[in-house]
Amino acid sequence: MNISPKAIKVRNIWIGGTEPCICAPVVGEDDRKVLREAEEVCRKQPDLLEWRADFFRAIDDQERVLATANGLRNIAGEIPILFTIRSEREGGQPIPLNEAEVRRLIEAICRSGAIDLVDYELAYGERIADVRRMTEECSVWLVVSRHYFDGTPRKETLLADMRQAERYGADIAKVAVMPKSPEDVLVLLQATEEARRELAIPLITMAMGGLGAITRLAGWLFGSAVTFAVGNQSSAPGQIPIDDVRTVLSILQTYSR
């Protein structure tokens, strides 16, 4: 298999290689539901798991978060785990933690050894440097993300976001938009294709909702390394069941070579 020089290896999978990866979210509200959902999702063999910890009601109880993360690790085995606390401003659930407390929790979860990647939002700006240092210390990969739930900005804005993520030290840059027209979907795909040629890190991009479904199925042809698919419960508008995504990816891979 030919591996792109910008691809990264996380456990046994390559992100940004020649094959698109499927990531399935886990969104349980308590430890029992998180672990049960993870068991169901892992039976479908995604390439990655994302724990959306902003759905976790006890997120302000660090001991319970760490115990749940360790339980997830035991269930996932060698499937890489992405830890995400999505802010309310970018489509996440309201949580009782301020930014400093979120960073402290991220540090604890990185040091636990239970996770492989962590998502941190581009909007945090210079504070990304603190998270970058701790992820490097803990050998955890950093995804720097930006989500536009109210529309789709200009291509130049999306490119600037991905460039900025790389400048802040991201291992992976992620951008998601909410299209209002087919033209918006094309803007996202054009930005992805241009960023793929320019940046030295893997990308994750998607257009959400029904209009954006094509980007979840064919975005990898334009440079998006990971698509998010429903394993049990959706974490964002427009996510498609993992079995359907796998079927379409297989067809596209067969006929696009």
Swiss-Prot record:
Quote the EC number: 4.2.1.10
User: Which keywords does UniProt give here?
Assistant: Amino-acid biosynthesis, Aromatic amino acid biosynthesis, Lyase, Schiff base
Pathway involvement of the protein, from the record? Metabolic intermediate biosynthesis; chorismate biosynthesis; chorismate from D-erythrose 4-phosphate and phosphoenolpyruvate: step 3/7
Q: Where is the active site?
A: H147, K174
The chemistry this enzyme catalyses reads: 3-dehydroquinate = 3-dehydroshikimate + H2O
Give residues annotated as binding 3-dehydroquinate.
Answer: E50, W51, R52, R86, R216, S235, Q239
Q: Biological process GO terms, please?
A: 3,4-dihydroxybenzoate biosynthetic process; amino acid biosynthetic process; aromatic amino acid family biosynthetic process; chorismate biosynthetic process
The similarity comment for this entry is:
Belongs to the type-I 3-dehydroquinase family.
| NCBIfam families, per database record | aroD
Under which name does UniProt file this protein? 3-dehydroquinate dehydratase
The species this protein was found in: Geobacillus kaustophilus (strain HTA426)
